[in-house]
Amino acid sequence: MSDFQREQRKNEHVEIAMAQSDAPQSDFDRVRFVHHSIPSINVDEVDLTSRTTDFDMTYPIYINAMTGGSEWTKQINEKLAVVARETGLAMAVGSTHAALRNPKMAESFSIARQTNPEGIIFSNVGADVPVDKAVEAVSLLDAQALQIHVNAPQELVMPEGNREFSTWLDNVAAIVQRVDVPVIIKEVGFGMSKELYKDLIDVGVTYVDVSGKGGTNFVTIENERRSNKDMDYLANWGQSTVESLLESSAYQDSLNVFASGGVRTPLDVVKSLALGAKAVGMSRPFLNQVENGGITTTIEYVESFIEHTKSIMTMLNARDISELKQSKFVFDHKLMSWIEQRGLDIHRG
């Protein structure tokens, strides 16, 4: 594939992702908090700091991996970096493979660090990247963490995608040993299982981003790029973000769990945190805001989002994320069926 074709693919991904909408029914709607009528705290007492093993985030919300690798996506990353800088959000760039192959593409990613020199930024590579290239991806952004995206369904639907996965786990283990920043194993919209969490812990991984189905759908994106569009039957593949968080319940003492995938509202963020996430990523909402409304509008959107999150935590009598995890909630029958069939031990406040 030529550099031009790779740039074109990056742009196609963004265009199709922006045109997608969230699933009409979300598993977030299957989780309900138990309301407490008289809170004992005030909104200004709520502390949204997210504390992980290696770094603290001012807010438990981050701009998740999206793009880079073309002139247009360079402009998007620059805008998002301004938003991150002005609001204090952490930010992840998309896969840096384009820059690792072609140094001319490096600035479409490094612009994020140039624009936001003091912020928390995650770099991003695939699970098959050579170890030395993973180190290079961290250096490219002076990144605080490295996301390794695992995207087998996307690759298999992608016409020119990878068909070899047998070395992925061993390669992840080698990267974890080599890089000097935390490694976040990140799904891309298909969710994670308790079996995967155990496998990752066994090779030294301490961070995951569960990225469940319900948001950007890469099966749909890649199927649109197929000449006969014949793999749309896989559009519902995988676990939702809520199911993936439930699957992580037994491993949350060993893993820093981040949540993403179909997160629509501050209430979805608060539910994710209550279910064990330390931070919550969003992609398409930020992308649409910054491209359709501009930087100032996106900053206002983030500020409003943060205030709404604090309001919900006040209703739940939670001064911080640790107290939020003690909130009481109930699941509907479909989630209860998942919990029972999967043998999950879930704390519900």
UniProtKB/Swiss-Prot annotation:
Q: Which HAMAP family does the record cross-reference, listed alphabetically?
A: Idi_2
Q: Which Gene3D superfamilies match?
A: Aldolase class I
Cofactor(s) for this protein? Answer: FMN; NADPH; Mg(2+)
Q: Which residues bind substrate?
A: R9, K10, S95, T96, H97, Q154
Enzyme Commission code: 5.3.3.2
Instruction: Tell me the Gene Ontology biological-process terms attached to this UniProt entry.
Output: isoprenoid biosynthetic process
- Classification of source organism: Bacteria, Bacillati, Bacillota, Bacilli, Bacillales
According to UniProt, the name of this protein is Isopentenyl-diphosphate delta-isomerase
Q: Which residues bind Mg(2+)?
A: E155
InterPro entries from the UniProt entry: Aldolase_TIM, FMN-dep_DH, IPdP_isomerase
UniProt-annotated binding residues for FMN: A65, M66, T67, S95, N124, K186, S211, T216, G262, V263, R264, S283, R284
Domain of life, per UniProt, equals Bacteria
